[in-house]
Regions:
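Active-site loop segments of alpha/beta catalytic cores
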Residues: 1-68, 72-315
Length: 315
């Protein structure tokens, strides 16, 4: 079995005699793990032609090395810095063995929680100019669909949609306002991406419970991050929607960042115990492994996963 097949088994919610697959939306510790860092925007400034292609090739090689070392089923190409660079990275990955993995990229043109400088202006506009906001949202959604189509045509099999809709105390808009200004466009984009043949993973942090049924009803294949920091219980989410959607994540990132190991173990084992049975679970953190998470803590989290059952990659 290839890593790709392992991931597909989980996305299809099929029971397997193995531990669940794993991956992270972002794994930013490659310098500590591999002695290689991902490219930054600054690396590509004023670089073109063969030199740019070489840098993108090094980027693709880092993705492959990390996926192999960490036994990921997915390789997610980060949103970076242009769509053409993403597509070129995907092509290089496909040429160098990336087809053994589920190639994944981002396309989510729905409103997300605005940053602090824009928040009040955004919510006032919903009241003062709703028709203009809806027209903008519709046009932006269509651009997201076109972006997703180009990624799929380049070889991406899984699209992530990572607009955050929720704070730790609930959605940033009421469910009714979410339906009007976000939900209809979220549904449109999910359905279009699936019509193009992609699997769709929806990510949002925070307390998703007031929106849970809405998020799943769109027809997504998987839901990430099942945020324990916001009090979301993966056992309850599994009970409510586990027959309709694959669940991803829920290992407490605060515990991964701060420790101790006993707390990391408790969170990891809770996820494996309550989300793995019956299939339809992908092991991972409740967000991403970002700079600042001690590598040894993340590797400990993975060691608990390795102990939880056999790997199809080793059979």
């Amino acid at each position: 079995m290839k890593p790709r097949d392992w991931g597909l088994t989980a996305l299809r919610r099929e029971v397997m005699p193995y531990r669940p697959p794993t991956f992270e939306l972002e794994m930013q510790l490659t310098e500590e793990l591999l002695g290689r860092r991902y490219l930054t925007l600054e690396d590509l400034q004023a670089v073109s032609g063969a030199e740019r292609h070489q840098l993108l090739t090094e980027r693709a090689e880092t993705y492959l090395l990390a996926a192999e070392r960490l036994q990921y089923a997915f390789i997610r190409v980060r949103f970076f810095p242009t769509l053409e660079d993403e597509i070129e990275t995907i092509r290089i990955l496909r040429q160098r063995g990336g087809e053994d993995y589920l190639l994944t990229a981002e396309a989510d043109n729905t409103f997300r929680i605005p940053d602090g400088n824009e928040y009040l202006q955004f919510v006032y506009s919903l009241k003062d100019w709703p028709d203009e906001v809806l027209e903008y949202a519709s046009n932006w959604c269509d651009k997201g669909i076109k972006r997703g189509k180009r990624l799929i045509d380049a070889g991406v099999e899984v699209i992530t949609m990572c607009a955050d809709y929720c704070f730790n105390n609930g959605p940033f808009l009421s469910p009714e306002m979410w339906d009007r200004f976000i939900g209809q466009f979220y549904y449109r984009q999910v359905r279009a991406l699936k019509d193009y043949g992609a699997y769709v993973i929806k990510h949002t942090d925070g307390d998703i419970m007031p929106l849970l049924e809405r998020l799943v009803d769109a027809g997504i294949d998987a839901l990430h991050s099942i945020d324990p920091i916001a009090g979301v219980d993966i056992a309850e989410v599994k009970r409510l929607v586990g027959d309709r959607v694959c669940l991803i994540g829920n290992v407490d990132l605060a515990k991964l960042q701060q420790g101790p190991l006993e707390d990391i173990e408790a969170s990891a084992r809770y996820c494996l115990e309550h989300a793995s049975p019956g299939g339809g679970y992908i092991y991972g953190s409740c967000n991403s492994i970002f700079e600042g998470v001690p590598l040894e803590n993340y590797m400990y989290m993975l060691s608990l996963w390795q102990e939880s059952g056999p790997s199809p990659l080793e059979s």
